[in-house]
């Protein structure tokens, strides 16, 4: 699947020359640059979500543009989050495993268990 392939690619790029790959360049610049990108993309997702929500409220609105922007920005956020996880020697499988652990558990119960 795409997530598995992307995870493998991100691992390969960790050791690549920084002038050959955007991901390798991010890894070389380090965690602060990677986190800066995660923060930037988070903000862009928030703005795109707000724009999409506003567009949906307009009578007879065509929201295709705003929806596409939201999906695109979310993909950017996921991508940079995966780069962050890779840089920290983790990956999407760890997140999927955690989501699986939480599945079927009340959100309130799960939150209380973390305290």
Task: Annotate each predicted stretch with a short phrase.
Residues 1-74, 78-115:
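Flexible "arm" and connector segments at domain edges
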């Amino acid at each position: 699947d795409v997530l598995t392939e992307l995870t493998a690619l991100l691992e390969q790029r960790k050791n690549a020359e920084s002038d050959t790959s955007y991901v390798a360049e991010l890894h070389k610049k380090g965690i602060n640059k990677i986190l800066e990108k995660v923060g930037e993309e988070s903000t862009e997702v928030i703005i795109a979500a707000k724009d999409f929500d506003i567009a949906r409220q307009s009578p007879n609105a065509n929201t295709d543009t705003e929806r596409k922007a939201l999906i695109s920005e979310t993909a950017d956020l996921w991508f940079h989050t995966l780069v962050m996880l890779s840089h920290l020697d983790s990956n999407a499988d760890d997140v999927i495993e955690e989501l699986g652990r939480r599945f079927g558990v009340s959100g309130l119960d799960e939150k209380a268990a973390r305290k």
